[in-house]
């Protein structure tokens, strides 16, 4: 929105045309879809039960163009970030808009590109970046899971998800 100088409605229409939005756009705008993905990634990372309801959600629906412009004036961009960490109180998960430096790897993300940053005591930061929205990436991910199941490859998260 910021880099293209488009209104929210124009960006929304473009994202819809590109196949980036869920059938119910509130799943995206409300951070719900991303929160579900965070819960699944957290279960893999920490070996815990997937608990979608434990993710604290705040979407991007309330972000205005003024908010975006003020952030830019300070050298930041507003990005929807999911953060998962194990604390002394247990697993904490949140999906919320955050200010990130516009020159940072997260600040440079555009369009349907996603990024996962994993931090470890011994390895520091590991960054995974790639296509994360649209028909192609979604179909690829689903087919990969289907093929793993067909091959009998155990998917650890399936035992942690109770529907």
How would you label these PLM feature ranges?
Residues 161-163:
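Conserved small/polar residues in nucleotide/adenosyl-binding loops
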Residues 2, 9-108, 113-115:
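Substrate-binding/catalytic subdomain of NAD(P)-dependent oxidoreductase enzymes
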């Amino acid at each position: 929105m910021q880099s293209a100088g488009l209104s929210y409605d124009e960006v929304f229409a473009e994202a819809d045309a590109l196949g980036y939005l869920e059938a119910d756009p509130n799943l995206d705008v409300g951070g719900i879809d991303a929160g579900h993905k965070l819960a699944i990634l957290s279960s893999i990372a920490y070996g815990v039960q997937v608990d979608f309801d434990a993710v604290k959600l705040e979407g991007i629906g309330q972000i205005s163009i003024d908010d975006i412009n003020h952030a830019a004036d300070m050298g930041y961009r507003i990005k929807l970030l999911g953060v998962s960490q194990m604390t002394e109180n247990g697993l904490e998960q949140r999906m919320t808009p955050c200010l990130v430096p516009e020159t940072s790897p997260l600040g440079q993300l555009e369009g349907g590109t996603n990024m996962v940053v994993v931090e470890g005591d011994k390895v520091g930061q590991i960054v995974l970046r790639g296509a994360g929205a649209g028909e192609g990436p979604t179909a690829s991910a689903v087919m990969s899971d289907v093929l793993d199941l067909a091959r009998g490859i155990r998917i650890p998260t399936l035992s942690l998800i109770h529907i």
